[in-house]
Amino acid sequence: NDYDSDPIAQIVEWGRQGVVLDATVNLSASPYHANKSGIRVAVARSAAASLNHPFLLANQVGGNDDLLFDGRSVIAWPNGTAVIAPAWKEGILIADLSSPEGCVWIGDGELSILGSDEEIEDEEDDLLDAIIIGLSDYCRKSGISKIVLGLSGGIDSALAACVASA
């Protein structure tokens, strides 16, 4: 826990005081790093189990200055089932709180549904996607429409060409 307060504990306490909630929504801007999606799913599952109702974690997507956000929003149920939105894609996740199978993704890519004993696997392409999204969003937000590449033939040039062509 990176915070002085514990919002999940506070919501649990409200429940003890008679407050009834159908779900909890967390609007997040959690920066990307390798294996972050597994941590995010574990946090959402833990929150849903503690709260005894669905926990929805909506995460930002795209590049913002020197930070990258992979999206991958999560809906977790108290039984550990989780629905995960696609990485690096903007879209709308429509939640059906009664059934993971009823959730709908409007956008590119597809939802993943994980059973309570399944872990999310970070895709091997995540790092490349992060670099491409970061460079693309930086150029778009900075008004850069053309880039000149100086290529020497080394591995770094091959990587630069690969990113530029994506």
Where are these regions (language model features)?
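Conserved G/P- and acidic residue-centered "switch" motifs that form tight phosphate/ATP-binding loops
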Residues: G154
